[in-house]
Amino acid sequence: MLIKSIGMYLIGILILFIALYPRHSFAFEPNIDFNAPDWVEERESADNDIPELPRAGSLFGSGDKPLFSDRRAMKPDDLITIVISENANANFTTNKNYNGASGGNVTPPSIEYTGNNEEQKQIVSELNDQAAYNLTKANNTSNFQGGGAQTRSEALNATITARIVKVLDNNTYFIHGRREVLVDGEKQILELSGVVRSFDISKDNVVQSKHIANAKIAYTSLGPISDTNHKKPVSDGIESLYPF
């Protein structure tokens, strides 16, 4: 009865510890920082204050809808469309073999007396008898063989509209975009940030994700369906603390 009470007490303490302990302490939770990289923060912003010259008698000014030029994102808070097409394939194989063997004998040296003194001969003979031992090392053989293989294939295809956060002095833009879609209580979140060149923006104001430097893309889902793909905190904690 006492052992049962102690066991229940320890189980209760373990459950309480797991419930109160932060979940991220047991398992690694992937996270992405979408803030601008340090080199973007350190770089000077470009001067976008371009004065508009008066055009006396002209029917077409340099407004937001120019007649003979493409309307592309050029300044902070302009919007730009990002076409995300990311494919990742990985194949990894490893094999390791190890064979080792050891053993041997050690024989001590003997003393030889070439004189005629019988007493000395007797002493040398006794010394040789006392040292007449062979040191033998036990034979040892070890073998190890291991290997592993991993194959992964992932794809993400989506479209998102991002905002220019900062225009750098080298004609590149730091962008950030976020989109949330709620369907039947399941929230899907797509977030992106990175640096694009003005030359990579098409005439339709579109950039492919492969042209984004320091690209950070996250696609997550929150809701009852996605919760079934994650372990519960108690199960996760017990597995993390299990020593075997």
Swiss-Prot record:
One GO-annotated biological process of the protein: bacterial-type flagellum-dependent cell motility
Signal peptide: 1-27
Pfam families: FlgH
Keywords: Bacterial flagellum, Cell outer membrane, Membrane, Signal
Primary localization class, coarse: membrane
Transmembrane listed as a keyword: no
Presence of the UniProt keyword Signal in the record: yes
Domain of life: Bacteria
Any GO CC annotation of this UniProt entry: bacterial-type flagellum basal body, distal rod, L ring
Subcellular compartments: Cell outer membrane; Bacterial flagellum basal body
GO terms for MF: cytoskeletal motor activity
HAMAP family in the record: FlgH (MF_00415)
Family the entry assigns: Belongs to the FlgH family.
Subunit structure of this chain's protein: The basal body constitutes a major portion of the flagellar organelle and consists of four rings (L,P,S, and M) mounted on a central rod.
General function of this protein: Assembles around the rod to form the L-ring and probably protects the motor/basal body from shearing forces during rotation.
UniProt name for this protein: Flagellar L-ring protein
Species for this entry: Helicobacter hepaticus (strain ATCC 51449 / 3B1)
Gene: flgH
